[in-house]
């Protein structure tokens, strides 16, 4: 392992011991904000420190075993100890480097999930509904909560657009690679000739930012319209103008929310979505600039980037970013998408490790 990495690990170890002492200090215990912040930092460092401790122990084991190689009676046992320790050391070093990768501070946040029907007419709307059901079932398996903020239903079923807030542990970290174009190839129910059609939807995943991190939005840049919330088929579901549509004039972004019966609550939710969209747009712009110099699995910021194809006749799903194909389409559409999500996260970490190893 590089001396620079060992030096960084030593510093983290010192900080861990410092935090341990601080958490036992009466003045910190009486200050809930400080205690909470230190506890969080302490728990984040715990795995790194314990893994580093194991790394040091394995190196010590190897050094001690090497001293026994000249002893004929102990040589065989020493060689076994060295081999076993070196094998484990390799795994521990790899794990340590992953733990040292820069953390995306947004990973632990809840996420807004937006699904929009694209090309393909009614079939695209039906597929948007299928995707929302897939993510909802995945959320259920993860014990996350899904709250629909806005929905525009398609005439043949599914959605022209749906926006939901997904709440739980590490939601954004798990779902952020889902942003992009999702394409479906199948025979629509309305197709009498049995021809395969291709339709598409775009998915956008954005972190729900805490108020302290939300950008300031100039009220003069907003146009706010109110209207009556509609249910399926267009019927009005209440008699007051509680639904809210906010247009951000400089960017043309439009956010609607009709989830609550209170206009005030709908406005607050719509503003929160708008704030996240504005931050995401800025991050996408940076991602597009980075994508010109290196591969970026988070995409170039273009929501039409085709990331995945769902082929029903062949029962397969292909992720085009890492050339991964699985032949368990039914399971995937029922929410079992970890086998698509985890390889992308692993590949992203490998890219980060490669960038880290290029540093002096």
Swiss-Prot record:
GO MF term (any one): translation release factor activity, codon specific
GO cellular component, one term: cytoplasm
Post-translational modification: Methylated by PrmC. Methylation increases the termination efficiency of RF1.
Entry-annotated residues carrying N5-methylglutamine: 235
Highest taxon of source: Bacteria
Pfam families cross-referenced by the UniProt entry: PCRF, RF-1
Entry's localization field: Cytoplasm
Classification via InterPro entries: PCRF (IPR005139), Pep_chain_release_fac_I (IPR000352), Pep_chain_release_fac_I_sf (IPR045853), Prokaryotic/Mito_RF (IPR050057), RF-1 (IPR004373)
Chain segments annotated as coiled-coil in the UniProt record: none
Keyword terms of this UniProt record: Cytoplasm, Methylation, Protein biosynthesis
Family per record: Belongs to the prokaryotic/mitochondrial release factor family.
Cited function: Peptide chain release factor 1 directs the termination of translation in response to the peptide chain termination codons UAG and UAA.
Protein name stated in the entry: Peptide chain release factor 1
Lineage of origin: Bacteria, Pseudomonadati, Pseudomonadota, Gammaproteobacteria, Pasteurellales
